Amino acid sequence: VMIDPATLGAADLAGVSRIAKAGGAQAVAAAAFGTASIPKCRKIEGPGSPWFVAAKRVLADKIGSRLPAGPSEVILFADGSLDARLAALDILIESEHGTDSSAFIVTTSAELAQQVTAILPEYMALMSDERAAYARTVLTGTNGGIVLADTTEDAYRFINEYAPEHCQILSGAPDAHVAA
């Protein structure tokens, strides 16, 4: 898996001299104690799975970290002008984090809502059973799903009142949906 060039650029600006591609509780342990290929680190940052967060808590006396990340929450505003598969994938990326996540698609397009509803089971079938169960719980419960708004203003109102951690705009004209 390639590391995003923007991440590498930011790391270079911050003076990072070495990057290890690793994840999960095992990455926290490797950073806390060191391994043959990963030197012991002073600090580990960033969000992660519940196992990653638990490992950071357990090893807090061995490696520094800020407060653990909470559940993920996202609202994706989709105006229907782009591929529904993108909306489905983006919402699954957040909803698979755990049952305490929240993930909504907000749209004024009934067609997009129907397309995403049809596509989601196909993509969930490709996920691990655990991640698919998380996504299913989030997307069929009170913390997620598809909100079909009557007007764009109603969509904006819902998004602003919910005030999610992440808000994405999926539109062929994204600037039209950003307040001046």
Task: Show the residue positions of the predicted features.
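Short hydrophobic alpha-helical runs that function as membrane-insertion/retention elements
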Residues: 1-2, 18-21, 104, 167-170
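Structural motif
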Residues: 3, 79-80, 108, 150, ...
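Short acidic active-site motifs
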Residues: 6, 27, 151-154, 176-177
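Conserved NAD(P)+-binding/catalytic subdomain of aldehyde/semialdehyde dehydrogenases
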Residues: 13-104
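Flexible, acidic loop-helix segments that line cofactor/substrate-binding pockets
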Residues: 68-75, 97-148
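Nonpolar helix-loop interface/hinge motif
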Residues: 155, 159-160
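C-terminal core of ALDH-fold dehydrogenases
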Residues: 161-180
